[in-house]
Amino acid sequence: MRQKLLAAGLGNEVLVDSAGTHAWHRGEPPDPRSVTHAQRRGYELTGLRARPVTQADFESCDFILAMDWDNLTLLEEMCPPQHRTKLGRLSQHARQSKAPVIPDPYQGGAAGFEHVLDLVEDACDGFVEFLRQKKDARRVGTS
């Protein structure tokens, strides 16, 4: 997401973060297979560490995008009612794929990781375009 925002000229306007709905892997780096497949596409994940979603995230974030329905449901349960409009699925922004969710890659071997990266890239492209359109609409509305 960060690289796509930078390429779109939005890198200095959007803070990207990642968090999980469970604290099982708190403080751990990404799975080595994720790192390897991401690096093949030019993405650097080595500085990332797992952390759980916190109540502060619901306050400070403009968008909180889940990868699948189960995680979206957990986020809805955790989220204060006044912030539920910030929640959604990353896949709803996909431009090519019609997959309703981005699946867990861990059971699909190398092909599973590549498929998930394809889905994430497509959805991130769509989300960046969504943000660009929102920015353009604000600019037109204030002119």
Set out the residue ranges of the language-model regions:
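Short polar/charged helix/loop
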Residues: M1-S143
